[in-house]
């Protein structure tokens, strides 16, 4: 049992210069990744709609394929990093994502819906590794700095709130008559940049003892009450957010006839809501407890749905999606922090990999359902489904 003096010493442990550098490097990578992902959420759905014409049942398939790729890549990428270390894992997967973005661009030029989706799938594989930025920053950080480190890395995603959608507007017509083809060139550049910048992280690899230690069975770890709360909160928070966010461009542009700039504005502020709270979510967790922050996040997501059901004007979409983003941040950051408490270093890969597999499998299902529910039943029923 840890002695009181040791506990007091742990509480006073200050983040080292290495910890701060890891936060900075991974925050930049998170910002670039979220710029690319925000770009994809906006452009891929509209690209799907352009390719499919009036039949919008499968307009969200590109987003679904990205999320299927992310779900499929969660466990392999976690084990890749266990084997080669965080740095090598991030570099390798960024190259896969870059190839995927280039393939998507080429498929657009050839008007190949299947090829476009395959490229998006490869980008999703990279996304599985990029989701590990939040875990990686906590690997070597002192316990009292973990929540803040995680929230600061997630906060950097606020860059994507504006860079992603603005990049879509600037690049959607640069390659001539094929709308959005140039956007996926930008996606390739964002993705490649993360693989270069991440070289600057300094996270120790597992020791020989940690690597050979298989730890407890996965089922035993995930059946702990803390682990159950962590996985459920992260999964539901992401599924609800993704269901509504994926359908929003269709609802605004196709259903309600709002202009592209209004849709971009709503998505930008949704992303601000998702990531800007990260500058203080860690402090809120340390002050009010992680469970209270998760509960507040769930309440905000419910409020978001209520506002969306009231009306479909631009202000309704704006406030609803903004609250949806804040709610997601509280729930997801809280779930991530809880998950770091249930495993040892040797158990890290399988626990984090399975957690993200569950989360992104749920997201993929929600994404596919979003287009189908919207096509047959409309925007209000998408919101009822979120409830």
Predicted regions and their residues:
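Juxtamembrane intracellular "pre-TM" segments in multi-pass secondary transporters
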Residues: 2-20, 202-231
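Intracellular juxtamembrane helix-capping segments at the cytosolic ends
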Residues: 44, 127-141, 330-344
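Hydrophobic core of transmembrane alpha-helices in multi-pass small-molecule transporters
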Residues: 31, 113-128, 316-330
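Cytoplasmic helix-loop-helix junction between adjacent transmembrane helices
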Residues: 117-155
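C-terminal ends and interior cores of transmembrane alpha-helices
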Residues: 95-110, 300-312
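C-terminal membrane-cytosol helix-exit motif in multi-pass small-molecule transporters
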Residues: 168-169, 188-209
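Short amphipathic helix-loop junctions that connect adjacent transmembrane helices
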Residues: 43-56, 246-266
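Helix-to-loop junctions at the C-terminal end of transmembrane segments
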Residues: 73-86, 276-290, 374
């Amino acid at each position: 049992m840890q002695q009181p003096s040791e506990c007091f010493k742990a509480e006073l442990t200050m983040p080292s210069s290495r910890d701060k550098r890891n936060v900075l490097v991974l925050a930049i990578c998170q910002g670039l990744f979220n710029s690319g992902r925000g770009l994809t959420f906006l452009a891929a759905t509209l690209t799907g709609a352009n390719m499919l014409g009036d039949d919008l049942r499968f307009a969200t398939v590109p987003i679904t394929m990205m999320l299927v790729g992310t779900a499929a890549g969660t466990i392999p990428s976690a084990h890749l990093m266990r084997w080669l270390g965080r740095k090598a894992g991030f570099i390798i997967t960024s190259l896969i994502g870059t190839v995927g973005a280039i393939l998507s661009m080429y498929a657009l030029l050839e008007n190949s819906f299947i090829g476009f989706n395959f490229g998006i799938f490869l980008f999703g594989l990279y996304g599985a590794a990029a989701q590990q930025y939040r875990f990686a920053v906590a690997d070597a950080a002192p316990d009292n700095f973990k929540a803040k480190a995680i929230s600061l890395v997630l906060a950097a995603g606020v860059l994507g709130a504006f860079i992603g959608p603005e990049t879509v507007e600037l690049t959607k017509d640069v390659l001539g008559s094929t709308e959005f083809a140039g956007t996926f060139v930008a996606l390739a550049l964002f993705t490649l940049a993360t693989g270069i910048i991440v070289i600057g992280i300094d996270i120790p690899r597992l020791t020989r003892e940690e690597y050979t230690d298989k730890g407890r069975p996965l089922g035993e770890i995930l059946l702990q009450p803390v682990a159950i709360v962590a996985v459920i909160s992260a999964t539901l928070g992401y599924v609800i957010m993704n269901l509504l966010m994926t359908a929003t461009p269709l609802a605004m542009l196709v259903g309600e006839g709002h202009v592209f700039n209004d849709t971009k504005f709503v998505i930008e502020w949704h992303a601000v809501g998702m990531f800007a709270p990260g500058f203080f979510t860690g402090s809120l967790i340390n002050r009010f407890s992680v469970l209270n922050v998760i509960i507040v996040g769930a309440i905000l997501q419910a409020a978001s749905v209520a506002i969306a059901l009231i009306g479909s004007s631009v202000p309704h979409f704006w406030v609803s999606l903004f609250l949806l983003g804040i709610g997601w941040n509280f729930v997801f950051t809280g779930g991530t922090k809880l998950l770091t408490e249930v495993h040892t270093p040797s158990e890290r890969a399988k626990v984090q990999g399975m957690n993200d597999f569950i989360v992104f499998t749920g997201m993929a299902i929600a994404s596919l359902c979003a287009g189908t529910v919207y096509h047959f039943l409309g925007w209000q029923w998408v919101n009822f489904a979120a409830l």
